[in-house]
């Protein structure tokens, strides 16, 4: 579309409500428009990647994104990857989102249990002591037998 059309707020809002990834084609000012980005991440959390940098640090926006797609945690700002509630919401939606969490949270027993309960293969992203924990490994292999490969030696 021509640049003026990609800057047409009403038109772009209509587009992102139908496909969050349409945010990729929006004008720079619209990628910084909170309502626009919220509409996009409600459709697909991973659309957060196309938001202006300051909005990737917006807790409410990022939380909406990870609730829709756990792996959208990848696109959230660094401090949000260390936010326990944020990471818990992400791993509840997709256990493999654990890979994008701040290192200290990969050692959080409750959080890792939630992640491996959702997807056993998330065990590969857990801190080493949890990979050696029988109870944690059992939880992971009950969800996916192949998770055994990620248990500590």
Regions found by a protein language model. Give the residues of each.
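Thr-biased low-complexity repeat/linker tracts and other Thr-enriched repetitive architectures
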Residues: 1-153
């Amino acid at each position: 579309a021509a640049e003026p059309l990609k800057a047409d707020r009403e038109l772009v809002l209509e587009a992102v409500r139908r496909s969050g990834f349409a945010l990729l084609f929006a004008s720079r000012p619209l990628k910084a428009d909170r309502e626009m980005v919220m509409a996009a991440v409600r459709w697909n959390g991973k659309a957060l990647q196309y938001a202006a940098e300051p909005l990737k640090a917006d807790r409410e926006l990022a939380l909406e994104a990870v609730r829709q797609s756990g792996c959208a945690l990848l696109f959230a700002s660094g401090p949000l990857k260390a936010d326990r509630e944020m990471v818990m919401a992400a791993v509840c939606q997709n256990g493999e989102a654990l890979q994008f969490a701040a290192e200290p949270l990969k050692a959080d027993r409750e959080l890792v249990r939630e992640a491996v309960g959702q997807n056993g293969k998330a065990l590969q992203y857990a801190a080493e002591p949890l990979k050696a924990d029988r109870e944690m490994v059992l939880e992971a292999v009950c969800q996916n037998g192949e998770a055994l490969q990620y248990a500590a030696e």
